[in-house]
């Protein structure tokens, strides 16, 4: 009889990728995934530490799991093994056992390949096991081959960690220094994904355009080199990459957006602020003019490219003028979609110890104003697509029985009616008939 594995994933697409790899890792040991936490023999929370709210969600969920464990005991059932993985595990370590002593395993994002051994120790009645080692090479060398097909769109991790040390960010402390997988590893995993019917590959990294992996004859490949290599894979239709840092947008990568048709005309390029003063305080290593120059060059290379970004409001010391500078940047760039957040002090980061923290009510007010402007731009872009024909990759079911959902080249969700689901996994021409803030509606030509 198979054992059941339940994984709840928080945060970024890298965590989504890691969760898939954990499934692949534990499958040979008899664990099959379930979406029902009540039947799980192992419960894994793959956590995010980028903001305080995200971290506290972990502890709230652990509280609910404790109640589930108590119910099991009352019914005479064995309790599940509880694992806290990911960036909260890396950042808080032993503190997790102090706050939630019923947790069995704490494992960092570079160490989860040791989960089979850690789980076997818990089965042998060892408790409160922790593994937070930072050996990036070991993680990638021990990743299993893809067992669970990800569908029409497949995420592949090519780079982890960050050397930029932005003063608001915990990534260098939870994911470590920048490390890139070899070209051979990435190419082999990409071939496997395409053999499992993936039409699109999305390359992942905390700072993906800093990729510098070893290729044939020990040549160092840039991200542009890697993309050119992957573009040669037969039956692969689309390539994307995320998340990028403006300082690593090299000439060859910018030019590739104009020459490689498989590279989609959509780029997530976080700027965080439009104020030079705040950019310097954040240690972003560039100013607003540098960012504008990158945007202009991308649009010169490919005129139909659409941009996305991240913004943080209320960073310590942010004045009304600094915030106005951010709004000005948004107005000038004109984004297709964006993500925006209030600054959240993270323990251990330089921003957290600054004495000029912004009051919450001011942060909330600024976030509302910014999000209204970003929503206006996103809706305008979506509405501009009505009446046009777009190539859509259908990759998942909709809420309704005869509905499926796909993605345009610009990462917009498109809903259509397809009663027999025959278009799942295919790229087809769709005429856009309706636009909303977060989605499009279309019809097959």
From Swiss-Prot:
Q: A Gene Ontology molecular-function term?
A: metal ion binding
Name of this chain's protein: tRNA-2-methylthio-N(6)-dimethylallyladenosine synthase
Supply the source organism for this entry. Rickettsia prowazekii (strain Madrid E)
Which Pfam families does the annotation name? Answer: Radical_SAM, TRAM, UPF0004
Q: What is its main location?
A: cytoplasm
Cofactor(s) recorded in Swiss-Prot or TrEMBL: [4Fe-4S] cluster
Q: Which keywords does this Swiss-Prot/TrEMBL entry list?
A: 4Fe-4S, Cytoplasm, Iron, Iron-sulfur, Metal-binding, S-adenosyl-L-methionine, Transferase, tRNA processing
Query: What is the free-text note on the cofactor?
Result: Binds 2 [4Fe-4S] clusters. One cluster is coordinated with 3 cysteines and an exchangeable S-adenosyl-L-methionine.
Return the EC number.
2.8.4.3
What is the protein's known function? Catalyzes the methylthiolation of N6-(dimethylallyl)adenosine (i(6)A), leading to the formation of 2-methylthio-N6-(dimethylallyl)adenosine (ms(2)i(6)A) at position 37 in tRNAs that read codons beginning with uridine.
């Amino acid at each position: 009889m198979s054992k059941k594995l339940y994984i709840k994933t928080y945060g970024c697409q890298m965590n989504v990728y890691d969760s898939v790899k954990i499934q692949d890792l534990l499958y040979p040991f008899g664990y099959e995934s379930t979406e029902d936490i009540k039947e799980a023999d192992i419960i894994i929370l793959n956590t995010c530490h980028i903001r305080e709210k995200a971290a506290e969600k972990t502890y709230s969920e652990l509280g609910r799991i404790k109640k589930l464990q108590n119910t099991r005991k009352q019914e005479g059932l064995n309790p599940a093994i509880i694992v806290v993985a990911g960036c909260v595990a890396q950042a808080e370590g032993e503190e997790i056992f102090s706050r939630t002593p019923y947790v069995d395993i704490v494992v960092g994002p570079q160490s989860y390949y040791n989960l089979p051994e850690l789980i076997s120790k818990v089965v042998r009645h060892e408790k409160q096991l922790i593994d937070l080692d930072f050996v990036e090479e070991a993680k990638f060398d021990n990743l299993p081959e893809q067992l669970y097909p990800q569908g029409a769109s497949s995420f592949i991790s090519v780079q982890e960690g960050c050397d930029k040390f932005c003063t608001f960010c915990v990534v260098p402390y939870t994911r470590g220094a920048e490390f890139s997988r070899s070209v051979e590893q990435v190419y082999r995993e990409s071939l496997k994904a395409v053999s499992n019917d993936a039409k699109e590959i999305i390359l992942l990294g905390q700072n993906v355009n800093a990729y510098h992996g070893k290729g044939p004859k020990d040549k160092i490949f840039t991200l542009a080199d890697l993309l050119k290599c992957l573009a040669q894979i037969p039956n692969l239709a689309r390539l994307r990459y995320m998340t990028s840092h403006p300082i690593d947008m090299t000439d060859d990568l910018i030019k590739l957006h104009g020459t490689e048709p498989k590279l989609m005309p959509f780029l997530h390029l976080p700027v965080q602020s439009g104020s030079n003063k705040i950019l310097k305080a954040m240690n972003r290593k560039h100013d607003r003019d540098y960012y504008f120059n990158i945007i202009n060059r991308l649009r010169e290379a490919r005129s139909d490219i659409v941009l996305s970004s991240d913004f943080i409001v209320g960073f310590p010391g942010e004045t009304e003028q600094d915030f106005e500078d951010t709004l000005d940047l948004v107005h000038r760039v004109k984004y297709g979609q964006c993500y925006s957040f209030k600054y959240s002090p993270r323990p251990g980061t330089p921003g957290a110890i600054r004495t000029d923290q912004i009051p919450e009510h001011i942060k909330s007010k600024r976030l509302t104003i910014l999000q209204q402007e970003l929503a206006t731009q996103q809706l305008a872009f979506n509405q501009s697509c009505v009446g046009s024909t777009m190539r859509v990759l259908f990759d998942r079911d909709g809420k309704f029985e005869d509905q499926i959902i796909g993605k345009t080249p610009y990462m917009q969700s498109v809903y259509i009616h397809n009663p027999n689901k025959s278009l799942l996994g295919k790229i087809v021409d769709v005429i856009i008939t309706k636009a909303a803030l977060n989605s499009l509606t279309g019809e097959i030509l």
